[in-house]
Amino acid sequence: MFSIFKKKTSVQGTDSEIDEKITVKAKDKVVVSTEDEEVTTIVSSTKSTQVTNDSPWQDPTYFSSFGKELMFIATCMLAQLLNQAGQTHALCIMNVLSKSFNSEANNQAWLMASFPLAAGSFILISGRLGDIYGLKKMLIVGYVIVIVWSIISGLSKYSNSDAFFITSRAFQGVGIAFILPNIMGLVGHVYKVGSFRKNIVISFIGACAPTGGMFGGLFGGLIVTEDPNQWPWVFYAFGIATFLSLLMAWYSIPNNVPTNIHGLSMDWTGSALAIIGLILFNFVWNQAPIVGWDKPYIIVLLIISVIFLVAFFVYESKYAEVPLLPRAMTKNRHMIMILLAVFLGWGSFGIWTFYYVSFQLNLRHYSPVWTGGTYFVFVIFGSMAAFFVAFSIKRLGPALLLCFSLMAFDAGSIMFSVLPVEQSYWKLNFAMQAILCFGMDLSFPASSIILSDGLPMQYQGMAGSLVNTVINYSASLCLGMGGTVEHQINKSGNDLLKGYRAAVYLGVGLASLGVVISVTYMLENLWNRHRKSEDRSLEA
């Protein structure tokens, strides 16, 4: 296939310009501009040709109007909202669900953990599938899976089986796993690296995390207020909202986003090793608090999961031709530090989320709707945090914002660990939630921007997968760890507050370690920038 582009050069310091038509024989190649030449880039492939001109924001051929771009941004924000609402709409009615299925108290953790477990385990491959087969296609697949299994989750009431409900929620999580990473991949393709608009869009997407948490919990609580037996409509309503999002995505997402122009292939061996290892490892940590660590199958599964995960990393580093994890990431210590800090921060928040709702329902005896309504703080301060990120990330840099986010996660967990049961909501509780908003809304855009800008264009879906894998998987895994601590401290089950606080102390420890890592990364980043600045001044 032959492609034509214009090369723009200056002639001997004059303002005159020469337009040269240059024919380039290219197949799945990108013409990259040089230091001295301003080149209009053409991406050519056997399937489609994309032209990227000098627009400071994105390729203007993606959107026919500003209104359509706004709809695209709204679709991206809804994806994040659904991701968080998918967790809290069930969390705030967990006592209703437990009573409906006659579940034991210990099984409540599984009613909540199966969704983020599946989402976190499958997100890792969903971005790569989007990079290979089309980001929009995989996004649509994710929406369809969520719609189908949301309906089945509601119908599970008639099975009278909590195991069936837990399985349905897991498949619902698989669908969610295909939504957000591919949305983030589309943002990475549509908007230019480092552009202000890209930072704005990612910040707005991040703002929908606390907003989604509030709407999910509030509407879940509202539906069961009059009649708890109507809880299936919580999931039917979620399916309807997902269907409307599907229609928006179908219409607003451009069809001309390049697909696999670099000829990537799927690493099925690495994918299988990763998924099996992640699921088994997570299962062990969530099942052990229920049955006890002395059960032989728990120890056996733990050993098997570790073997699979070690095999995955060995295979990816030495044998995979096209590794699932880009080597540009696995060999970059700073990217690993970022992902580890995000893991620890969101892991502590996963513990906070479950035990905060348990605290309100079981100790303060709030109704499900009031428990969900307390998340309104997240909407207000989450929006403030999003605007702060959007307009400060260029000045402060994502490294500093990531550090602030870990401090917010840590402060929120510390405040929860000393929160009195009888104290008014408007004191420590209100302040705690306001601070936690900055943990969520600073960490997501900061880490997403660092990885999106740091990885090649062909890995944009994978960049979205990495951040969201860490966020979702850490929430489920660390909840299991928190459950282990809780049951060790409150073995009799008669001292809920003592057990809850013990789990939250673990969250404090995780977030504190995240602060240490993020501060280390920030200082190294500042030192490298200072050193480069000195090198430039010496060269000048």
Swiss-Prot record:
Q: Which N-terminal residues, if any, form the signal peptide?
A: none
One Gene Ontology cellular component term attached to this UniProt record is: membrane
Where is the protein found, in the record's own terms? Membrane
Q: Which residues cross the membrane?
A: 62-82, 109-129, 132-152, 170-190, 204-224, 233-253, 273-293, 296-316, 335-355, 373-393, 399-419, 430-450, 462-482, 503-523
- Membrane topology of the entry: Multi-pass membrane protein
- GO process annotations (BP): borate transmembrane transport
Q: Which GO terms describe its molecular function?
A: borate efflux transmembrane transporter activity
Report the sequence similarity comment from the record: Belongs to the major facilitator superfamily.
Q: Which InterPro entries match?
A: MFS, MFS_dom, MFS_trans_sf
> Which CDD domains does this UniProt record tie to the protein?
MFS_Amf1_MDR_like
Lineage runs:
Eukaryota, Fungi, Dikarya, Ascomycota, Saccharomycotina
Residues on Cytoplasmic side: 1-61, 130-131, 191-203, 254-272, 317-334, 394-398, 451-461, 524-540
Protein name, as recorded: Uncharacterized transporter YMR279C
| Primary location class | membrane
Q: Which UniProt keywords apply?
A: Membrane, Transmembrane, Transmembrane helix, Transport
Q: Which organism is it from?
A: Saccharomyces cerevisiae (strain ATCC 204508 / S288c)
Spans within the Extracellular topological domain: 83-108, 153-169, 225-232, 294-295, 356-372, 420-429, 483-502
